[in-house]
Amino acid sequence: MAIPVPVGLRPGGSVLSAPPRRAGSVRRTTTMDFTWPDGLAGDTVLDGRGRDLRTNGDGTATVLVEASLAMVTDPRRIIKEIGSIPNLPTLRSLAGESAMPGYRRRLAATPAAAAAGTPLYQLLDDVPGATLVSGAAWQRWYDMDRYLELKADVRHRIMTDVCTGYQHGSSALQPDGTLRWSQDRQPAVDIDAVDDDLAWHRHARPEGVTMRRARRIDVWVAGPVIHVDAFFQDSSTLPAGGRQSIHEYTLTAEADRGTGTVRTLTPVPRVLPYHECPLAVSNVAALAGLPLSELRGAVLERLRGPLGCTHLNDMMRALADVPDLAQHLPPASGS
C-alpha cells in the first residue's frame, strides 16, 4: 500500500545547483564531504567548508567570510576529533560525545553558539542531519544483503512516524515498522556543473566512497521584500563513476524587509527516496508569519515527526540566517 501523493508534489529530478549570481545579492554555500579511509566499519572523516560571497551592484564579487570544519567520528558516531577555521577551542568539549543524539543541545551550551549566523555555525549545526544520511553512500558499493548485515542496528530499527516518509501506512515501511530498503535514487547534477567559477566555494573532491551535503542560499532585496532562493542536495559517488542524488530540494521564499516575517515559503522536491516523502511540503504553511530568525527552533517545534522531512527541515532551519546575510547586502540592492 502507498499513501496518495498529488502529481504536483512528485519529485522532478536533479537540477543545476545555482542560477547566475544576481547583482546586489549575497550567497552562502556550504559543503560537507564524508569519507571512510578504513572502510564502512572504520572511522568517518568529515571535511566541511563554507563561504559567504557578496555580488556587488556592478557584478564584482567580494568574499565576506570563509570557514571550515574538520571532524572524525568512530563507528558509533562518537566524536574523536574536531577543529575549525576560524578556530573555536571550545569545540573540543564535544569530543567524546555523540555527533547525533543531544549534539545540538551540547553545541548550544558552548561559547560556539556566539558564532550563530555564520557559515561555520551552519556547518556545526548541520552535523547530526548530515551524519545521519552519510552511511547511505555505501549502498551502491555493497550487495544490499551485505550492507544490511553490516548495518544490522539500522535494519531492525522501528521507523514508524519518524518523518513524513515513514508515517504510518507508508510504502517505505514493512508491517512491523522497519524499512523496506527499496529507495529511489536519481543521477545527480554535480554542483559544479554551472558556468561560474565563483558559484561555489572551493570544496573537497575526495575519490572512492563519499557522501556530500551541499547547500546554497541566495538573498537579495527588492522594495519591501527580502527574497531567498535556496538549494539542498545530499549526493554520493557511484562505483561506475558520477554521483547519485539521495535528497534534493530547491526552495524560494519571501519575507517582509521591515519585520523579517515569512510571507511565502515554497519548497520543491527534486529527488527523495520514498514515495510519500514529498508530502512534507504540504505542511510548511505552519511557518507562515513567523520571523525568519526564529525558524531554527520553530521548524523543530511545528514540523516534528510525521509532519516533516528531516532534510527539508534542516534546509528551512538554515533560513534563520537570512537576516544576517541581508545585513551584508550592498546598499544599492534595495533601490
Predicted segments, located by residue:
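Long, positively charged binding patches that form subdomain-scale interaction surfaces
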Residues: G169-S245
